[in-house]
Amino acid sequence: MELRDLQIFKSVADQGSVSSAAKELNYVQSNVTARIKQLENELKTPLFYRHKRGMTLTAEGRKMLVYVSKILQDVDELKQVFLDSETPSGILKIGTVETVSTLPTILSSYYKSYPNVDLSLQAGLTEELIREVLDHQLDGAFISGPIKHPLIEQYDVSTEKLMLITQNKAFHIEEFTTTPLLVFNQGCGYRSKLERWLKDEGLLPKRIMEFNILETILNSVALGLGITLVPQSAVHHLSKAGKVHCHAIPEKYGSISTVFIRRKDSYMTNSMRSFLKTIEDHHHINML
């Protein structure tokens, strides 16, 4: 069993097919197929179910994936320990929720100071970003917080005011029972705040419509499709143009914090250390 066998196994498990894994690894398909078969023979157990749509892990394959992911992560960290230079460089894989208003400033400041670092940015919802940080798929992520998890450390980024957004200038709380709610999928911090508020008020929304893109939600509100709850900074341009109206909500639900998270046990590269310093400096400036 060689390291590349584990890399091939992980790629097939992630991609769900030999062809996609071969493309990702720049291998010929026959080589990938042979390596997987050899691995199964060596372990004396099938690791994948083969079907027309591709390949999915068996129960033993899922067990194997846990160990392989840890081994490959340890190998990556070993390389980082010996290859990490004093000058930040390499790739930082960062996740973020869509409405971090301070993100452009943080990224711009970091890039100007450390141009040798390649920043790979991935958007997502808070819950899925936490999962990807825990699974070592991301080096860190900006999420709605704070959170409590034994494997995660967090750094304050900003606190923003949440506003109820409607097309009409006037709003009455009873409208929640007659007007659709436009929200992100489950796992969004803003949605959680809104649902908690409605539950406490004993209100049942007429309909919940889920979206993946912030601009789609805001433009739909502007067209009268429904109402939503987002940070005030995210809707400033539409509010200023008079296309939507912002309404304050009870203080208990009216703000949300953004934090940056990373695994406590992951190796701290100079690139990550300098990124955290940039976040800290920016947070300090905002607090002045």
UniProtKB/Swiss-Prot annotation:
Domain of life: Bacteria
Claim: Transcription regulation is one of the keywords in the record: yes
DNA-binding region: 18-37
Species the sequence originates in: Bacillus cereus (strain ATCC 14579 / DSM 31 / CCUG 7414 / JCM 2152 / NBRC 15305 / NCIMB 9373 / NCTC 2599 / NRRL B-3711)
Coiled-coil features, chain-numbered ranges: none
Gene3D superfamilies listed in its UniProt record: 3.40.190.290, Winged helix-like DNA-binding domain superfamily/Winged helix DNA-binding domain
One Gene Ontology molecular-function label: DNA-binding transcription factor activity
Protein name as annotated: HTH-type transcriptional regulator CzcR
